[in-house]
């Protein structure tokens, strides 16, 4: 029972941290304020996480596991390159829309002054998505379906830049500009420019 309670408390801490990041836009989250929001002492927080960086790391891991397991499902279910790209874009944007506090972490908004390892993790997160898109585009070049009309690296870079820009705009607008807003029209324009 103690192990389950530990897991539940860890989960509670992470959920409250994500909620506090959403509510306190532009403000740093201290371990003291987080402990107060969770309803425990700072010492209790440190029994579950060695540092605030470890809490951020746990939320980054959650994001990676969620996104990449769903990307794998998309790849298993869809063969068309344009559908794969569209669904991956929508997946990342809608995940962020549902998790605004976590979005602040993955775009680095709350990582100023934090451990460089955290910055590397979020950079790697976007690099993995870009790499996956690049692989999809390479495979498309070998198929009879739609193919990228330009340099694969340039197309993958443009798609990941679009995603990062939408997430940044979401945070900078105090979460009022939803990442999925206008996605159908924007993807239609991008698709026409990227594929033949």
Regions of interest found by a model, annotated:
Residues 39-49:
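Short hydrophobic/aromatic patch on the recognition helix
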Residues 1, 61-87, 139-141:
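Amphipathic alpha-helical linker/stalk segments
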Residues 21-24, 30-31, 42, 52, ...:
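Amphipathic alpha-helical segments enriched in hydrophobic/aromatic and basic residues
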Residues 58, 73-98, 152-159:
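Hydrophobic alpha-helical connector segments
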Residues 1-37, 54:
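Basic, helix-initiating cap at the start of DNA-binding domains
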Residues 65-68, 72, 116-143, 153-157, ...:
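Amphipathic alpha-helical packing segments from all-alpha helical-bundle domains
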Residues 97-117, 168:
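Amphipathic alpha-helical segments used for helix-helix packing
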Residues 94, 98, 131-139, 157-162, ...:
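C-terminal peripheral helix-coil segments that are non-catalytic and often amphipathic
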């Amino acid at each position: 029972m103690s192990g389950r309670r530990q897991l539940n408390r860890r989960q509670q801490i992470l959920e409250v941290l994500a909620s506090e990041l959403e509510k306190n836009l532009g403000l740093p989250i201290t371990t003291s304020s987080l402990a107060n929001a969770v309803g425990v002492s700072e010492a209790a927080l440190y029994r579950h996480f060695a540092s605030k960086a470890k809490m951020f790391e746990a939320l980054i891991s959650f994001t990676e596991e969620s996104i990449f397991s769903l990307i794998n499902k998309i790849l298993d279910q869809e063969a068309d390159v344009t559908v794969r790209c569209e669904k991956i874009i929508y997946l990342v944007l809608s995940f962020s829309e549902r998790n605004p506090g976590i979005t602040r972490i993955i775009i680095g908004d709350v990582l100023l002054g934090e451990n460089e390892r955290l910055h590397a993790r979020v950079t790697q997160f976007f690099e993995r998505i870009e790499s996956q898109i690049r692989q999809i585009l390479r495979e498309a070049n070998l198929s009879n379906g739609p193919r990228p009309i330009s340099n694969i690296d340039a197309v993958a870079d443009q798609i990941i830049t679009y995603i990062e820009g939408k997430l940044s705009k979401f945070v900078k607008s105090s979460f009022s500009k939803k990442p999925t807003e206008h996605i159908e029209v924007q993807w239609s324009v991008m698709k026409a420019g990227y594929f033949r």
